[in-house]
Amino acid sequence: YDTTGAIELTGNTNWNQSNHHLEAGKSYIIKNKFNGEINHTSGYLNGGRFTIFVEGEWTPSQNQIQSADIIILKGGKINTDSFTSFLIADNSILTIQSGGSLIGNNINLAAIGVLLKNFGTISVNSMKDLNTTSILYNAPKATINVTGKSVASWEQSVFTKGAIYNFGELTIQEGALKFNSQDATCYFYNGTEATINTPTFIIGGIGVNDGTVNAQKISNDNGGNPTFTNNCSLYAQNSFEFGGTSGTIIMNKGILAGGVENGTFIAIPSFKCGNSGSTFELNNGSMIKAEIMDIPNVTFKAAGTRSLIKSTKSISTGWTTKFNGNLDIECPEGEFAKGVPANNPNYIM
């Protein structure tokens, strides 16, 4: 970035007066420390946008920024810890370069024209509202760390109605990551070699996994009709629940299991799908591995090279579980559809 000619912001000097404010089309730079007030709405900008380069440390004095192009340079930092919540508001782009960082409690993204591009480090407690059409991009080798401390039970540590494109590492220490993106052009994507670590992973909209998702629990939060495509590794250490939905899980060379131990896929202890007509498409050597599977009124389809459903304990079917296509089913003898009379099965093969 060329910072030549950028006006320096220093100390606690305020830039929010009618005769002394940040102007659209102009560039500013924070070389050392700055905690003065700025015009944090679009009032003086006439629809334009200003640019702020952060080379030192910026401690904002207001809890939002609007109509801004903010670039955190290598070694630069924005610290919003003094606010319970900080909003990157409409018509704003925040870019964090490699070696730059964003620190805060809760960071939210507004709905109109908001893009957060991370090539460095984000360390926050939560990101509770990444609004419709907003975009969070996490680059290869970039990291997002969300502690998730004291997030209310009805909230998620990270919740997006817009888009998350993760190509680096996204870790949530406590709570849940939920995506509820309903637009095929603005959705959840976990890229090749990318990793997501979260206690709970909630599938609420349109998403694709080409990397690795490590969770203790995967669910759809008993609602919505999501479409999720898993082309790589989707791990649920404790449970997988896909209830109250007619949604679809599509797998292409994908694995849905409890994790990997000594080079072997381990089984999810509990795999449950509510009696609501969900569909699983297993294509080209995909596999689901679980201990106890409860799958009433679920349709399993398989295409391409042979795919596998493997239960290490039992499979319970129900009116009417359907299996079709190039699919193997492995289950301990006598534990498939146990108790269902052979002359009146509640499944179709």
Where are the regions a protein language model picked out?
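Extracellular beta-strand-rich, repetitive "passenger/adhesive" scaffolds
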Residues: Y1-M349
